[in-house]
Amino acid sequence: DNFKKASEMLKSAKRILISGHLSPDGDSLGSMIALSTLLNNAGYEAFAVADINALGKIGFLEGTKSLIPLRNLKRQKKFDLFIAVDCGAFDMMPPEVRPVAEKLPTICIDHHISNTGFGDVEIVDPYASSAGELVWRWAKWNEWKLDKVIAEALWVAMITDTGRFAYDSTSPRTFRAAGDILK
């Protein structure tokens, strides 16, 4: 089970870097924020990195305050684990992230059928509505608690990639995740 393998990788990690794709949309950004908050709440040191000048309409998310701006990535201490979210290929990540990520063990969390399989551990499900849904499933597997920041970020992730639950990617599991997030 890949949730188990990914959770095992976490056990030896001290500092975790999380990134999504270039020009993050709601799923990419929401998944990064939710996952970094979940991991920090669980006692890990997790840092999500993004181009904060390119957030546009989704910059309202409360969790954006904790993002590391891409321009500051080089000033960070070393990381020992990388997690890519909503990223179907390594070259879809920001160029600033790639030289750091390529040296690290990698977990890839993605829902694109075109995913190239670049992670050491893959949490990839092309039937999932969004990367946010997969982050939610991993959180449930680990029994991590959702707080307001996490719930808001996961909600934005899911409504972005489901077209507010209108696209074919929306499934009963998507609605179960959404219902859990709203609690």
Question: In which residue ranges do the predicted regions lie?
Answer:
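Fold-independent oxyanion-binding glycine-rich loops
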Residues: H21, D51-I52, V85-G88, I109-H112, ...
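A structured phosphate/pyrophosphate-recognition subdomain
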Residues: D1-L22, I33-N41, T116-K183
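Divalent metal-coordination and catalytic microenvironments
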Residues: D25, L35, I58, I83, ...
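Active-site cofactor/cluster-binding pocket
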Residues: I68-V121
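Conserved strand-to-helix beginnings and helix N-cap segments that scaffold or border functional pockets
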Residues: S28-M32, P94, S171
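Anionic-ligand anchoring segments at beta-strand to alpha-helix junctions in alpha/beta enzyme folds, i.e.
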Residues: I16-K78
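Hydrophobic "anchor" residues on beta-strands that sit immediately upstream
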Residues: L17, F47, F82, T106-I107, ...
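A glycine- and small-aliphatic-rich helix-loop capping segment at beta-alpha/alpha-beta transitions
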Residues: L38, T64, R98-I107, W141, ...
